[in-house]
Amino acid sequence: MQVSVESTSALERRMTVGVPVERIETEVNKRLQQTARRAKVPGFRPGKVPMSVIRQRYEDAARQEALGDLIQATFYEAVVEQKLNPAGAPAVEPKSFEKGKDLEYVATFEVFPEFEVTGFDSIAIERLQADVADSDVDNMLDILRKQNTRFEAVERAAENGDQLNIDFVGKIDGEAFAGGSAKGTQLVLGSGRMIPGFEDALVGVKAGEERVINPTFPEDYQNLDLAGKTAEFAVTVNSVSAPQLPELNDEFFALFGIKEGGLEGFRAEVRKNMERELRQAIKSKVKNQVMDGLLAANPVEVPKALIGNEVNRLRVQAVQQFGGNIKPDQLPAELFEEQAKRRVVLGLIVAEVVKQFDLKPDEARVRELIEEMASAYQEPEQVVAWYYKNDQQMNEVRSVVLEEQVVDTVLQKANVTDKAVSYEDAVKPAEAPKAD
């Protein structure tokens, strides 16, 4: 087999492969012999058909099959021989395909980039330091109580924070419009759910009252037919209800699965969850900075095939997440290209760090991560056992741990500054990383 390789760009290779006619004929004959054993030809017993008849009837098909299989087999033999690492399937162009002659074809494909990850000392990391204070737990209890607010009917004028049950009919220039009317709508005043001016105009109403209000749709309203127009809404108030925060008692604690320990036990459980959230938030922000730093220090050209594959994965995820009667390939590729490129580049960089530093998943950390995830469930021991019985889930956890070890490796070499902040600042969502 003869092989020659031409570099047509930084990552594209044009490989010419020549396959001797003897190898072709061996493969063709092998297939004809297999066919002869099972072929049914009128006038002959199975397995007794003369080879001349077999050739006449089946040689063309056997040759096409043999050539296709040989191209696939010799391509992989050639890339191994040439020490190439294809990043996707090749585009194959036959050059010589005649019977009785050598097969020659050209395979064009991209290869994975070869590079070394550098610039660790140029990466600046701000690592947040925070604790869960008693006041943070108090604030969380207030949030949990507000999330479980109940509304009770009152015989007074409505205030911000009250919940109204209303019917309304909206018109513009005396004409009703789509979506402008509803019955039995629950509306919390001050929630910002309705267009500006709607909720403010209902402050002070009482149950049974009818009121006409005239709010204006914003100029940037999504329905362009309504944008910037003033509407008239005839509103009937069916009821006014005031918010009632639940008491911190056993009934409230039971909503969160806490059946014993009283307030002290509930606070301890809330604190434990907050501490877990804090650790995860700090870890996530450090990881984002590490990845951004690796990207900035290591500009890597990536194969278009890998970006295309990642774009397709993101399309499928988008359809699964948002639903709708749409096929993934109907979503414009450009919507996902920047995110896809970032993922591909980071995947290559992380894999190279693993290779450079000979990293392997720390099984103790794998166990620790599984136990931490399991602690959020009612029966953590069962969750841990489930992970260890599921190879796919275990591999995913090991991948997460290996990525954490990459982050730790970078932190040992980067410029790290610790910064003390409040719990609230530490758990604020990090800004989305910029796509490179």
Swiss-Prot record:
Keywords: Cell cycle, Cell division, Chaperone, Cytoplasm, Isomerase, Rotamase. This is Trigger factor. It comes from Ectopseudomonas mendocina (strain ymp). It comes from the Bacteria. One of its GO terms (molecular function) is ribosome binding. HAMAP family: Trigger_factor_Tig (MF_00303). Gene3D superfamilies: 3.10.50.40, Trigger factor ribosome-binding domain, Trigger factor, C-terminal domain. Its EC number is 5.2.1.8. Pfam families: FKBP_C (PF00254), Trigger_C (PF05698), Trigger_N (PF05697). It is an enzyme of class 5 (isomerase).
